[in-house]
Amino acid sequence: MQYSYTPHGVCSRAILIDAEDGIVNKVQFIGGCSGNTQGIAALVEGMPLDEVVKRLEGIKCGSRPTSCADQLAKALKKVAEEQ
């Protein structure tokens, strides 16, 4: 199932998620640091939602209180609630 999340406090403008049965199939960040977001997206493909959240939640970007990785964790929590 496809999901869209609007991140807050980061450079990315949107996170597009394809997840089913508790597994991340695909993630795409719109905007943000291209290399970092592509790397995150590639690494989380095929992983359980809860494992991704556990690994990425709380990561900060510089002096910001959040990061694209942390925002992905927040998005995946919402996805898990809807599944």
Regions found by a protein language model. Name each.
Residues 1-4:
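Short, hydrophobic/aromatic-rich segments at coil-to-beta transitions
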Residues 6-19, 23-83:
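Active-site- and interface-proximal helix/loop "cap" or "latch" segments in soluble metabolic
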